[in-house]
């Protein structure tokens, strides 16, 4: 009986993970203002190379915070850049 519940729970989790992956794929191009993006993710969303994003961050064109050796960019900063 317990194994039946475990198997059903596992199947449900697999379904939920698949649904979440599908939602990410369908809506993945939308920039979420409160999400934090890496420079690579930002480059993909903006349709440019990562190095271009890093140059823009260093020039102050796109606002970002340096965390360790990497930059993190708030989605609202990407939206702000795109609306210029």
UniProtKB/Swiss-Prot annotation:
Could you tell me the superkingdom of the organism this chain comes from? Bacteria
- Species this protein is from: Magnetospirillum gryphiswaldense (strain DSM 6361 / JCM 21280 / NBRC 15271 / MSR-1)
Q: What is this protein called?
A: Magnetosome protein MamR
Question: Which family is annotated?
Answer: Belongs to the magnetosome MamR family.
Compartments reported by the entry? Magnetosome
> What keywords appear on the UniProt entry?
Biomineralization, Magnetosome
What Gene Ontology molecular-function terms does this entry list? DNA binding
Q: What induces it?
A: Part of the probable 17 gene mamAB operon.
Query: What does gene deletion cause?
Result: Normal magnetic response, slightly smaller, sometime scattered magnetosomes. Deletion of approximately 80 kb of DNA, including this operon, leads to cells that are non-magnetic, lack internal membrane systems, grow poorly, have reduced mobility and take-up and accumulate iron poorly.
A further note on this protein reads: This bacteria makes up to 60 cubo-octahedral magnetosomes of about 45 nm in diameter which contain membrane-bound crystals of magnetite (Fe(3)O(4)).
Q: What is its main location?
A: other
- Write down a Pfam family by its short name: HTH_17
